[in-house]
Amino acid sequence: MDYQEIARHFQTTSFDPQPFVQTAIDDRKVREKLVENVVDGQNHINEYFNSYLIIKEVATKNPELIYDEWERIWALHTHKNSYHRWIAHDLITQLLVIDHEDKFEAIKRE
């Protein structure tokens, strides 16, 4: 399965991320595109929110795969859209369990 196949499912309002999580875990390019959808902040809600749903599951199962995106994800916490701010907080929470670089200290100081 590739990103285009996943993206075809984004148009539904009852999106289930589960069928796509393993692909995102296994395929770095798919995962990167999904993260880009989330952090870009310009996409239609179905695209960024459904991408977020997949990425959240990836972060829950294997947070190491998303940890390198910490700064890009956290940058959303100042976004004008409250969904983006909420996504930033939610994903960072998933990454705290492996915060070996102690990146959360900078957030606590904010």
What do the predicted segments below correspond to?
Residues 1-12:
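Charged, compositionally biased N-terminal leader segments and the immediate start
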Residues 2, 17-24:
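Basic/polar, acidic-poor N-terminal "presequence/leader" segments
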Residues 2-4, 27-39, 63-76, 98-110:
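Amphipathic alpha-helical scaffolding segments comprising HEAT/armadillo-like alpha-solenoid repeats
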Residues 16-17, 48, 85:
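Residue-level detector of extended alpha-helical repeat arrays and alpha-solenoid scaffolds
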Residues 20-23, 57, 98:
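Surface-exposed cleft-lining segments at the edges of enzyme active sites
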Residues 42-44, 80-82:
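Short inter-helical turns and helix N-cap capping residues of alpha-solenoid HEAT/ARM repeat scaffolds
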Residues 56, 93-94:
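Structural signature of alpha-helical solenoid repeat scaffolds
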